[in-house]
Amino acid sequence: MFNQEPKIIENINVFNFTDLTATKVKGFYKDDPFPNYELSDDKASIVLKGDRNIYTKNLKKFIGHGKKILEIGAGTCQLSNYLAIGNNNSITAFDLNYESLKIGSKFATKNEIKNITFVCGDIFDNIFKENIFDFVLCNGVLHHTKDTYLSFEKSIHWLKKDGFVLVGLYNKIGRVRTIFRKYLFKVLGKNYLMIFDPVLRKIDKNSKPKIDAWIKDQYQHPVERSHSYDEVLNLFKKTRIEFINSYPSCETFQNDGSDKDEMLKKLFIKGKPANYFERILSQILMIFDRPGSEGGLFLFLGKK
């Protein structure tokens, strides 16, 4: 799997890195790993939460069995742990923050989740061998690196031919509401966010680490960029990745009245990138819907 021998510390494969941006991001997450677990979380609760989430449930179904999956920017490995439960897949949880991975590793050990490997390192280092993973997941991470496009190109080197890559990025238009809240947060403080941030309203008020982790990630991150649908489509074209679908869908006018849960299911079904006008409209509509209220993240699925 690796091009070089790692140090193994507390069941985590550790590679040293010196990149300044990576070091800055690592330091940012050190005290408040993201996403953090609820106090009561265990194997059963992670499965329950994952199965209740249309995106994660259908992602797991789409992946199937007997696959090698790399999650880049795994954080505390909630998704990696969920994807590893109840199948014979091999999951690699990859992040630059050792403290975050340690939380995920301890959770896996405590709950006897054995088909998961934890790797600490920088995406720009030559850590993994090429063409070894069936799925590469990079949801909400590439826009926190020093170069979104270069990090994407690096990640697909590790993807097998006919493998799938799922990329999630902040949207230039769809993130407007979060950016607006960010400015008000600087003036009004945390209490304002507890009332007006829809994600924080859902979190148990006693789960302070989880609350603090969300606030830091969404409103105080030192390295952050936003992108458009067309930027990702151009990146897919440049790297010879076939477009499968997106969420929200590029095909604004082809919406058959399905709710957002149904639209998330369609992320894993072959669609069309539509035309420029439809793509712009879809991104504008994000502002007024759930994706726009919860951070403005959009997803693109591609095939190598």
Where are these regions (language model features)?
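Conserved SAM/SAH-binding beta-strand->alpha-helix loop
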Residues: 97
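A short acidic, Gly/Pro-enriched loop at the edge of an enzyme's catalytic core
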Residues: 125-135
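Conserved class I S-adenosyl-L-methionine
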Residues: 164-199
